[in-house]
Curated annotation (Swiss-Prot):
This is Potassium-transporting ATPase potassium-binding subunit. GO terms for molecular function: P-type potassium transmembrane transporter activity; potassium ion binding. The gene is kdpA. It is a multi-pass membrane protein. It is found in: Cell membrane.
Length: 571
């Protein structure tokens, strides 16, 4: 079988499964968030936590709950890491250092899962499931809750601007969606040989004749939510390149499907919730809105996948010519198709899991996965974050389109006034500011040069790739992705602190702006579409929104990309 045919079959299979799951999964999630019925165990949980599930929150109440819950999560996870040495299942591991504990706590609570440590030798078999795996569930549920709150802003007409109850949305997202789906995925992964054990490890003899200690852990259960919740942090240092996490081509496809399932299906959830089920025309219109967003995601995802496949299938250099492709840093069991498909999916979402060494990608392939993040991770984006990210860009596209043709800027019957556009613009500007400022300061500081695996005189190949590594790190942290170019050493206090702050601001500033936007929209009355209303469903708006996404990224990041991946590719 040729590589091109293998790539085509894998992509076709992934798209076919997602197409089959799109309607039932999307509609199920809409029912979960729209249901007025609380399950018995949910009611018990609300009573224990003294939560009134029938209370609606304004945007600032909702945002306060998000920030309060996330702050408590950071403190708990930080404390758990610091004292893990005196807790059960720690083996001979001691407590985690303050800088690493801070960075890791922030990383997992923000759904980034950036890992500046070796999991096997740092985190115990208690810290992994009780601390990190729990955050894999709830951090994903937070993103989904914010997306649903924004959808309610378009749907509701409320004088007070109520957008739901965060605690109810968090509970339902965790227990009704993420937990059962993860259970099924974990069973499938177990059938493929993914390990599940609390044993500390076993010794074996390596190929060089020396004794090697092989770490064991409850991998399958954490691997499932790692991918489904677009978290990405591996329980083993090699992440999904490790045979204990991702042993077969089948498990590789399962993990890719888990990464894409919820972000893709949330566009159906959006379409279902904004349509009126009692009005056939409104229901169809809502679904067309969702399909339009999905089309934009698909165009961007497919384009970058094609670029990555072409770049990695090339034969640049002696080694690539001998191997038949750019196989450095890749697993033979996945090949170029499985590697490229995984890389584009993990950077197009906020997952950040890897089944190859991204630092070993070709300049064009590495640039493609970097661009995937710099687009704002909306192709198709993380669980929740991708949907509210592309909706914010849709508002900007409507505003720009209205200015171009003199039409009224409206979206789903809600007027886009100065307040709405300001909030949308602020949300979009957070990530570029963090990436460019963080990268600029880092490359200027002389103290950080020694941490770059690639360096040299200005303009040399080493310095160009070293710049790409720094740019990738801050793009990953600010977008809550978590993947990295491994040539950059990020264990210093500067990187631990700077990247930790980028993760915090990159996660919660957009959330605050999006929730404020939801509250502002919810307080408006709906207006009927007229002759001057720009259509927001169909091919024309798909092109406008795609162009807006690309234009925003190009204007913002082209100079930085020209200094890094583009310059490297032209050498």
């Amino acid at each position: 079988m040729t590589p091109a045919l293998a790539a085509g079959l894998q992509v076709a299979f992934v798209l076919a499964v997602l197409a089959v799951a799109y309607v039932p999964v999307g509609d199920y999630m809409a029912r979960v968030y729209e249901s007025r019925r609380h399950l018995r165990f949910e009611s018990v949980l609300y009573r224990l936590c003294r939560i009134n599930p029938h209370t609606e929150q304004t945007w600032y109440g909702y945002a306060g709950s998000v920030l309060g819950f996330s702050t408590a999560s950071v403190l708990f996870l930080y404390a758990l890491q610091r004292i893990q040495g005196v807790l059960p299942l720690s083996g001979d591991l001691s407590g985690v250092s303050p800088a690493v504990a801070f960075n890791t706590a922030v990383s997992f609570v923000t759904n980034t899962n950036w890992q500046s440590y070796a999991p096997e030798t740092t985190m115990s078999n208690l810290t992994q499931p009780v601390g990190l795996a729990v955050q894999n569930f709830v951090s994903a549920a937070v993103g989904m809750a914010v997306a649903v709150a924004l959808i309610r802003g378009f749907v509701r007409v409320s004088r007070g601007g109520e957008i739901g109850n965060f605690w109810v949305d968090l509970t339902r997202g965790s227990l009704r969606i993420l937990l059962p789906f993860s259970f099924v995925i974990a069973l499938i992964l177990l059938s493929q040989g993914v390990i599940q054990s609390f044993h500390p490890g076993f010794a074996s003899t390596g190929l060089d004749g020396n004794s090697v200690t092989n770490a064991l852990a409850p991998v399958a259960s954490q691997e499932a939510i790692k991918e489904l919740g677009t978290n990405g942090g591996g329980i083993l240092a090699a992440n999904s390149a490790h045979p204990f996490e991702n042993p077969t081509p089948v498990s590789n496809i399962v993990e890719i499907l888990a990464i894409l399932l919820i972000p893709v299906s949330l566009t159906r959830t959006f379409g279902t919730m904004v349509g009126d089920p009692h009005d056939r025309a409104s229901e169809v219109s809502g679904h067309r809105q969702g399909l339009t967003l999905l089309a934009v995601m698909g165009i961007l995802w497919g384009s970058l996948l094609a670029v990555t496949l072409a770049a990695e299938s090339g034969r640049r250099g002696v080694a690539a010519t001998a191997a038949g492709a750019m196989m450095e840093g890749k697993e033979v069991r996945f090949g170029i198709p499985g590697t490229a498909l995984f890389a584009v999916s993990t950077t197009g979402t906020s997952t950040g899991a890897v089944n190859s060494a991204h630092d070993s990608l070709s300049p064009l392939g590495g640039g493609a996965v970097l661009l995937n993040m710099l687009l704002g991770e909306i192709a198709p984006g993380g669980v929740g974050t991708g949907l509210y990210g592309i909706l914010v860009l849709a508002l900007i596209a409507v505003f720009v389109g209205g200015l171009l043709v003199g039409r009224t800027p409206e979206y789903l019957g809600k007027k886009l006034r100065q307040r709405e556009i300001t909030l949308a613009a602020l949300s979009v500007l957070v990530m570029p500011a963090l990436v460019l400022i963080g990268t600029g300061i880092t490359v200027i500081l002389s103290s950080t040069t020694g941490y770059q695996g690639n360096s040299g005189d200005p303009g040399s190949p080493g310095s160009i790739h070293g710049f790409s590594e720094v740019l990738y790190a801050f793009a990953s942290a600010s977008n809550n992705n978590g993947s990295a170019f491994g040539g950059l050493t990020v264990t210093s206090d500067w990187f631990q602190t700077a990247l930790g702050l980028c993760m915090l601001f990159g996660r919660f500033l957009p959330i605050i702006f999006v929730l404020a936007l939801a509250g502002s929209l919810a307080s408006q009355k709906k207006t009927a579409a007229g002759a001057g209303t720009l259509p927001t469903a169909g091919p024309m708006f798909t092109g406008l929104l795609t162009g807006t996404v690309v234009l925003v990224a190009a204007l913002t990041f082209f100079p930085a990309l020209a200094l890094g991946p583009i310059a490297e590719a032209l050498q």
